[in-house]
UniProtKB/Swiss-Prot annotation:
Segments of this protein annotated with the region Linker: 237-257
Family statement drawn from the similarity comment of this UniProt entry: In the N-terminal section; belongs to the N-acetylglucosamine-1-phosphate uridyltransferase family.
Keyword tags: Acyltransferase, Cell shape, Cell wall biogenesis/degradation, Cytoplasm, Magnesium, Metal-binding, Multifunctional enzyme, Nucleotidyltransferase, Peptidoglycan synthesis, Repeat, Transferase
Cofactor note: Binds 1 Mg(2+) ion per subunit.
EC number: 2.7.7.23, 2.3.1.157
Binding site for Mg(2+): 109, 234
Sites where the protein binds acetyl-CoA: 386, 392-393, 429
Lineage summary: Bacteria, Bacillati, Actinomycetota, Actinomycetes, Micrococcales
Gene Ontology CC: cytoplasm; membrane
Function: Catalyzes the last two sequential reactions in the de novo biosynthetic pathway for UDP-N-acetylglucosamine (UDP-GlcNAc). The C-terminal domain catalyzes the transfer of acetyl group from acetyl coenzyme A to glucosamine-1-phosphate (GlcN-1-P) to produce N-acetylglucosamine-1-phosphate (GlcNAc-1-P), which is converted into UDP-GlcNAc by the transfer of uridine 5-monophosphate (from uridine 5-triphosphate), a reaction catalyzed by the N-terminal domain.
Entry protein name: Bifunctional protein GlmU
Obligatory cofactor(s): Mg(2+)
Length: 486
């Protein structure tokens, strides 16, 4: 149910220079989705009446992602006046003029912050009757953060930036997490009063807190249960730390949901992956994107699946698959490479050193080893022997190969596409199929074997091969002489 008294402001205008990247900080992937997508998902879960996202640097790229992840969000461009206070000021101006509820302000770079924590913050704010409530934290190292200084009654007195703090204030372990809930009326009033009269020439949202206290309003601070919930991401090291924490949380959640994860330290699961109970993940498994695995399947070891569907009871080991579908009870690997468009039917097999692309492989069909099958269809219960390939590319265009059901394709057969092989047909070893093969036929390409005597001695004299042939010839001559009694 929509909370008509809640508006959310997502701050996404920062440049993120410490990332040292052409990609905006908030668009770096974390758990398979952009950093800001985590914050937008949390905003959606709160069911606010209004959501406003403030952008500036790389605004078009950010706006595109925001539009996909949270289409209902209003996008506001921050102007030339810098600072978080100015960003919030412009966001509030985009709210309906008669909005009189609460405004939650959250940074776009706190992906681990969950909806439950924000609900607690909003509830505490409403219960306390304060003009503003701040989320605070007790990190292991507080250096560099603004400190929360409380009154004797426990209310927030002021926020002191680290550089301005006394020794006694620096000893305070509680810091400002940079996430706020304001009453809309008080926020509008004080935003109009903040200035850029400071060393950085910026409008700070923290100045609103100071102005509220100076005007006699109460301001509260609510500590989070774990400081990592409000950890921001400013550089690659922090991104890596957040990824590790998020993955640990994700893996544990799936374990509690009935998934066996043999080695959590080497298993990575993106946040939009879906797993059924009784799935088993072996060491070195990476499940990326929107991968979905059904009950009883075993994945790994050393397997990466991206946007891939795995059916119930399937086994996939030492495999790399992207945009593929693996049927129930199918077997894949080891050392298989499934490229986009691969569909393997139930009980099918893609075995060792097999590569497939844009290929539909029927139920019970087998590609056991050393195959390339691209732009092809293989019917049910067909079997492709070792070394079978589809030659699908003529240098300009790709062409399809169609192999019927219950077909037996012998070792080292090459299909020169476009070509079709009917149901129940066979090929002989080494066949090059250039024409369609009727159902129930045997296709063979046989040429007489020609042996050119003495070729190595003439064309490769002095080589190890020539010397070996010479020794063999001498031995054969000696044996022949003995047999003739000479």
């Amino acid at each position: 149910m929509t909370d008509q008294n809640l508006a959310i402001v997502v701050l996404a205008a920062g440049q993120g220079t410490r990332m040292k990247s052409a990609t905006p900080k908030l668009l770096h992937p974390l758990g398979g989705i952009p950093v800001i997508a985590h914050v937008l998902e949390t905003a959606r879960a709160l069911e606010a009446a209004e959501v406003v996202a403030v952008v500036r640097h790389e605004r078009d790229r950010l706006a595109e992602v925001i539009g996909v992840e949270l289409p209902e969000a209003v996008i506001v461009d921050q102007d030339e006046v810098p600072g978080t206070g100015r960003a919030v000021e412009q966001a509030v101006a985009a709210l309906p003029a008669d909005f009189s509820g609460d405004v939650l302000v959250v940074n776009g770079d706190v992906p681990l912050l969950d909806a439950g924590t924000l609900r607690e913050l909003i509830a505490a704010h409403r219960a306390g009757g304060s003009a503003a409530t701040i989320l605070s934290a007790f990190p292991a190292v507080a250096a560099g953060y603004g400190r929360i200084v409380r009154t004797s009654t426990g209310r927030l007195d002021r926020i002191v930036e680290h550089k301005d703090a006394t020794e006694a204030e620096r000893a305070i372990g509680e810091i400002n997490a940079g996430i706020y809930v304001f009453g809309a009326a008080a926020l509008r009033d004080k935003l109009a009063a903040i200035t850029t009269d400071n060393a950085q020439g910026e409008k700070y949202i923290t100045d609103v807190i100071g102005l509220l206290r100076e005007s006699g309003f109460d301001v509260d601070a609510l500590p989070v249960s774990d400081s990592w919930l409000v950890d921001g991401i400013n550089d690659r090291a922090q991104l890596s730390e957040a990824a590790a924490k998020l993955n640990a949380l994700t893996v544990r959640a799936w374990q509690l949901a009935g998934v066996t994860v043999q080695d959590p330290a080497t298993t990575w699961i993106d946040v939009r992956v879906r797993l059924a109970p009784d799935v088993t993940l072996l060491p070195g498994t990476q499940l990326r994107g929107a991968t979905a695995v059904e009950t009883g399947a075993t994945i790994g070891p050393d397997t990466t699946l991206l946007d891939t569907e795995v059916g119930a009871g399937a086994t996939v080991k030492r495999t790399d698959a992207t945009l593929a579908v693996i049927g129930a009870a199918a077997t894949v690997g080891p050392f298989a490479y499934l490229r986009p468009g691969t569909v393997l039917g139930a009980d099918g097999k893609i075995g060792t050193f097999v590569e497939t692309k844009n290929a539909v492989i029927g139920a019970g069909a087998k590609l056991a080893h050393f195959n390339y099958v691209g732009d092809a269809e293989v019917g049910e219960k067909s079997n492709l022997g070792a070394g079978v390939i589809t030659a699908n590319y003529d240098g300009v265009n790709k062409h399809r190969t169609e192999i019927g059901s219950h077909v037996r394709v012998a070792t080292n057969t090459v299909f020169v596409a476009p070509v079709r092989m009917g149901d129940g047909a066979y090929t002989g070893a080494g066949t090059v199929v250039r024409k369609d093969v009727p159902a129930g036929s045997l296709a063979v390409t046989v040429a007489p074997q020609r042996n050119i005597e003495g070729w190595v001695a003439q064309r490769r004299p002095g080589t190890d091969a020539a010397r070996a042939a010479q020794r063999n010839g001498a031995a054969e001559a000696s044996n022949a002489a003995e047999e003739s009694g000479e």
